[in-house]
């Protein structure tokens, strides 16, 4: 018996539409979140399920980690795709997804943390043989 596959798209607009189309091509069901201001966006009509996560202010909706996790629980999804911006580069959110039993569809929280530290990231890239732009490699004093 095939396991049902379902993801939550935690973004809006063209980012959500592109992710939704790709997920559908891969055979996934899709739940999408939205703020009250975004209730008529196209990706919601294309989704299998749409869940309101808060008011228009993105700090209270698309950046509300608890609301996104609750929506994922409500929709009974396997993973959460943050898209771009909002929570996509938030290492703590990626870890919360994992700890809540959801696959964070993106880099691991460890990689997000590492790449957020530009000195450590540049050192790692050098170790891996990736060309880096020459320049100062230490912390900048203010």
Each predicted region: which residue ranges?
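N-terminal beta-alpha lobe that positions the nucleotide/phosphoryl donor
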Residues: 1-142
């Amino acid at each position: 018996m095939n396991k049902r596959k379902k993801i939550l798209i935690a973004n809006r607009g063209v980012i959500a539409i592109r992710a939704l189309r790709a997920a559908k091509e891969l055979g996934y069901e899709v739940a999408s979140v939205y703020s009250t201001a975004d209730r008529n966006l196209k990706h919601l009509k294309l989704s299998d399920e749409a869940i309101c996560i808060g008011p228009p202010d993105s700090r209270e909706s698309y950046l509300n980690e608890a609301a996104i996790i609750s929506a994922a629980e409500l929709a009974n999804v396997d993973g959460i795709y943050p898209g771009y911006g909002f929570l996509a580069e938030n290492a703590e959110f990626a870890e919360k997804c994992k700890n809540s039993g959801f696959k964070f569809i993106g880099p691991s929280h460890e990689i997000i943390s590492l790449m957020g530290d530009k000195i450590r990231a540049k050192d790692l890239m050098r170790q891996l043989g990736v060309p880096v732009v020459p320049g100062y490699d230490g912390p900048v004093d203010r």
